[in-house]
Amino acid sequence: PALVRTSPRECDLILVGEDNLVDCADWLGNCAGIVLDLADMPPLNDAEIEAILVSITCKMNDESMILLRDRVDRVDHLFRLVVDLDLDGAVIDAAAPGDSRAASALPRIGLAARAMNLTEQGRHLLIEIDEAPSAEDMLIAVAAGCPILVAPPPEDGLEETLVWLDSAVRGWMHELGLDGLEKLSRRNLRALDYDTASISGLRLIGYDRPLPMWLGN
């Protein structure tokens, strides 16, 4: 499956922004769902967002998915909208201001998702990064409660990259002493620097507990 702006396949999601809000109507009946990109829209209140979604979904199949997309620095607002509007999930752009890596953004996303009980409600979390993921990125995403990554295709062959990722993930799982991805959690993650530990609440490497400001949470 792919996230596209035009000409979707039946398994693809359409990314809907200000530029293709009208033209997307031509493909709504031939896709797996839509992702309304709030980062690519003018400021909207809840009622305006709901009105746009109603106008779009009336032309879609009943089983099609409806998701919202926004920046990682607005993740709490994004998750609230998903719950209040009873949508299928969210796409979070992990390329935060300052060009931070997904590794530091994902724990924050996981904390917000847990606070809203999104996983227990059966809603989907998709994390978007701006480069092909490494095995470490994939494991961090799963541990943070976000099992789906959206990323550009690798520069090398896709099949070769998937084989390499499978091998690398298995190696990491063996090193962690885990036999299934479902057993991976935040407890397996470590922050490599103080800033990441203070923002995310992860244990700082070499310090076997969260920083003092997180011990009460």
Summary of predicted features, one role per range:
Residues S104, E136, E160-A168, D179:
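Generic recognition of stable, solvent-exposed alpha-helical segments in well-folded globular domains
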Residues D88-I92, L165-D166, G177:
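Short acidic (Asp/Glu) and glycine-rich catalytic loops that position anionic groups and cofactors
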Residues P1-L36, A168, W172, D179-N217:
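N-terminal capping/small domains of soluble enzymes
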Residues L3-D130, S134-E155, L204-G206:
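Alpha/beta enzyme core
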Residues I56, I109, L165-W172:
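Hydrophobic alpha-helical packing residues
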Residues P153-E159, W172:
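Short beta-alpha connecting loops at secondary-structure transitions
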Residues A113, L139-V142, P147, R170, ...:
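A short, terminal or domain-edge coil/loop segment
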